[in-house]
Curated annotation (Swiss-Prot):
It is a single-pass type II membrane protein. The lineage of its organism: Eukaryota, Viridiplantae, Streptophyta, Embryophyta, Tracheophyta. It comes from the Eukaryota. It is an enzyme of class 1 (oxidoreductase). Belongs to the short-chain dehydrogenases/reductases (SDR) family. This is 11-beta-hydroxysteroid dehydrogenase-like 3. It comes from Arabidopsis thaliana (Mouse-ear cress). It is found in: Membrane. The chain crosses the membrane at residues 10-30.
Length: 309
């Protein structure tokens, strides 16, 4: 095995360079052709059953509205019943002919089973699962009073998503359906002051990349990597810590529209805003430069706002 490893160490670097110079242009051309083809074959979601977690606000709420405009049937999941009722009514007004709400907590495995069971009981099928539920917290890792305080971030962001995905898979196989995972740009790029959050999103990214291979070709998986979006989850943290929402952010409605377009085209990855894709590439090609830039941003602009007790 050591000999094989040595051979790979010697061969892969030059072969990779040869591939990049000789074959990568053809790869990009194929990608362009496939992109044009996807734009011509947008998925018709009318009367398709879509379950959305974290649907009471933010990206989940606005993605629900985009589906509603196209006539999809919706199962809306979140903890806040009052907010779900408002989103459901708005979705009906926008064009959804059938909307149900299922209050509950994605970090509770029994609730996740209930979400799927009630959706199937009401609609008889499931076509799209939009895994959007998540929580965000800005804190220096060493400033956790009790390290256990970080558990809810992983419980909701990672385990909550895997629980409901597990129960949804048999039904999505029947419908040849789709899973959409709303992760974060922090899954690929370090996010100072949100280490546990970034770790939870990185775990989701690798989980769904692996699951995509396991479930292919029966179930398609789209992974979304948004940047900072102006939502109820992120904006209060910026105001509390920095006095204003100064971080470069995108409106939630614009982000949701881009996500919906990407889902309809059958994209495997959706980076929104699109410039983040190039930041991810730079991180892979010259990681030290990206790390230096993030460190400068953190030390110069962010860290001074955090006063240690």
């Amino acid at each position: 095995m050591d000999i094989l490893t040595t051979i790979l160490n010697l061969l892969l670097p030059p072969l990779t360079i040869i591939f990049l110079f000789l074959f990568y242009p053809f790869y990009l051309l194929i990608k362009l052709v496939l992109c044009l083809r996807k734009n011509l074959h947008f998925e018709n979601v009318a009367r398709k059953v879509v379950l959305i977690t974290g649907a009471s606000s933010g990206i989940g709420e606005h993605v629900a509205y985009e589906y509603a405009k196209k006539g999809a049937y919706l199962a809306l999941v979140a903890r806040r019943r009052d907010r779900l009722e408002i989103v459901a009514e708005t979705s009906r007004q926008l064009g959804s002919g059938n909307v149900i709400i299922i209050p509950g907590d994605v970090s509770n495995v029994e609730d996740c089973k209930k979400f799927i069971d009630e959706t199937i009981r009401h609609f008889g099928k499931l076509d799209h699962l939009i895994n959007n539920a998540g929580v965000f917290q800005t804190v220096l890792f060493e400033d956790f009073t009790q390290i256990q305080d970080a558990n809810p971030i992983m419980d909701i962001n990672f385990w909550g998503t895997t629980y409901i995905t597990y129960f949804a898979i048999p039904h999505l196989r029947k419908s040849k359906g789709k899973i959409v995972a709303i992760t974060s740009g922090s899954a690929n790029i370090p996010l100072p002051l949100a280490s546990i959050y970034a770790a939870s999103k990185a775990a989701l990214l690798r989980f769904f990349e692996t699951l995509r291979i396991e479930l292919s070709p029966d179930i398609k998986i789209t992974i979304v990597l948004p940047g900072v979006v102006s939502t109820d989850m992120t904006t209060p943290h910026c105001i509390e810590k920095y006095g204003s929402d100064f971080i470069l952010s995108e409106s939630v409605s614009k982000c949701a529209k881009a996500i919906f377009r990407g889902i309809g085209r059958g994209e495997t990855y959706i980076e929104e805003p699109s410039w983040m894709k190039w930041l991810f590439i730079m991180k892979n090609v010259c990681p030290e430069i990206v790390d230096y830039g993030l460190n400068y941003l953190f030390v110069s602009y962010l860290k001074p706002y955090f006063k240690r007790d």
